[in-house]
Amino acid sequence: MPERSDPLTRSLIALIRGYQVGISPWLPPACRYYPTCSQYTLEAVRRYGALRGGWLGIRRLCRCHPWHPGGYDPVPDLPGSAPTQKPFR
């Protein structure tokens, strides 16, 4: 899927990358998920744009707390974008 290129999306990507490069290295590792919350949000914004991708990132950040087990949590695909299986006959 091609990367979104509207100004809001590019700005949000720049902010996330700024956090990843300038702030995150100075903090202890705390994310319970793979990919990390910032990488997840970056991928979601690149895939779905600033609004939907940003919303997915906010939802992910709300789930990242000590009482949640975490684990592998990839950015979801759009409904209907997964290959469909033919019905069994």
Curated annotation (Swiss-Prot):
Keywords: Cell inner membrane, Cell membrane, Membrane. It is a peripheral membrane protein. SMART domains: Haemolytic. Signal peptide: none annotated. It is found in: Cell inner membrane. Its main location: membrane. One of its GO terms (cellular component) is plasma membrane. Could be involved in insertion of integral membrane proteins into the membrane. This is Putative membrane protein insertion efficiency factor. It comes from Synechococcus sp. (strain JA-2-3B'a(2-13)).
